[in-house]
């Protein structure tokens, strides 16, 4: 499998691009990687803003990969553990202290 997202930093803007075209499902490794990367971006003085986008031309995201939900729930200590992680990641984005922008197109489904 390819990397869950592509991260670039240009002119003080970090761009995180979901890398699962054409549907850009929220895979477990995407959430894990975001949880790991967001604190680094928060602390990186070169980064003044974040842009969330997605690869391909069809959809920003069709939401969570439901085929992975059972596996993820087991790995995270049940469905509540999996959903708690997603909430932590959303809270990290909200409290990052840097503006974040999402460039949405096509379907944009999910919780948050």
Across the structure, where does each feature detected by a protein language model lie?
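Conserved CoA-thioester-binding segment of acyl-CoA-metabolizing enzymes
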Residues: 1-53, 57, 91
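Short, histidine-centered active-site or binding-site loop motifs used for metal coordination
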Residues: 18-22, 73, 104
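Residues at alpha-helix caps and immediate loop-helix transition turns in enzyme cores, especially N-
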Residues: 26-30, 62, 112
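Structured helix-beta-strand junction loops
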Residues: 44, 72, 96-99
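Glycine- (often His-adjacent) and acidic-residue-rich active-site loop
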Residues: 54-92, 108
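Glycine-rich beta-to-alpha active-site loop
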Residues: 88-112
């Amino acid at each position: 499998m390819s990397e869950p997202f592509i991260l670039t930093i240009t002119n003080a803007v970090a761009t995180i691009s979901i890398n699962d075209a054409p549907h850009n499902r929220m895979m477990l490794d995407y959430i894990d990687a975001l949880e790991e990367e967001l604190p680094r971006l928060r602390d990186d003085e070169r980064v003044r803003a974040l842009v969330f986008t997605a690869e391909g031309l069809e959809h920003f995201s069709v939401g969570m990969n439901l085929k992975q939900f059972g596996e993820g729930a087991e790995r995270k200590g049940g469905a509540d553990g999996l959903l708690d992680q997603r909430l932590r990641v959303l809270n990290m984005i909200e409290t990052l202290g840097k503006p974040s922008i999402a460039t949405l197109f096509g379907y944009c489904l999910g919780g948050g």
